[in-house]
Amino acid sequence: MATAGMLLKLNSQMNREFYASNLYLHLSNWCSEQSLNGTATFLRAQAQSNVTQMMRMFNFMKSVGATPIVKAIDVPGEKLNSLEELFQKTMEEYEQRSSTLAQLADEAKELNDDSTVNFLRDLEKEQQHDGLLLQTILDEVRSAKLAGMCPVQTDQHVLNVVSHQLH
């Protein structure tokens, strides 16, 4: 059974997923404004994935008798200048969420809370896939920049990379 402290940390992680979904929607909007529609579509799908993770955490917490609390968040509003900057930001955010998720899993293991450990390890596996995809995209965006591709060409390249990775 999850301890009260663990449940508070799970609640915080759930809110990180909520923040990530909002961040990805914000970044998607920026891409749409730049006519980078392939990347915008990818980021909206990532936002949906984060909402799904958030709901899984919400449901897990309810199943163990907790009362999850989704908190209000500040809307991300940073100015972006490039796809490279955008994907660097997504990687930084991903690494923060991934790190705290791993810490939670380790802590649950120390508490011998097997159901929480199993739940968190499943989430970690899913997030690792997302992290590999984001890193691949960032690497490809950097390569496209070095090759002199314009943003619209890079956007199309990102869409091709995502399509290839998902199939």
Curated annotation (Swiss-Prot):
Keywords on record: Cytoplasm
NCBIfam families, sorted: PRK15022.1
Family as reported in the entry's similarity comment: Belongs to the ferritin family. Prokaryotic subfamily.
UniProt keyword annotation of DNA-binding present: no
Molecular function via GO: ferric iron binding; ferrous iron binding; ferroxidase activity
Name listed for the protein in its UniProt record: Bacterial non-heme ferritin-like protein
GO cellular component, one term: cytosol
Positions of the Ferritin-like diiron domain: 1-145
Compartment(s): Cytoplasm
InterPro entries: Ferritin-like, Ferritin-like_diiron, Ferritin-like_SF, Ferritin_DPS_dom, Ferritin_prok
Pfam families recorded: Ferritin (PF00210)
Organism: Escherichia coli (strain K12)
PROSITE patterns hit by this protein: FERRITIN_LIKE
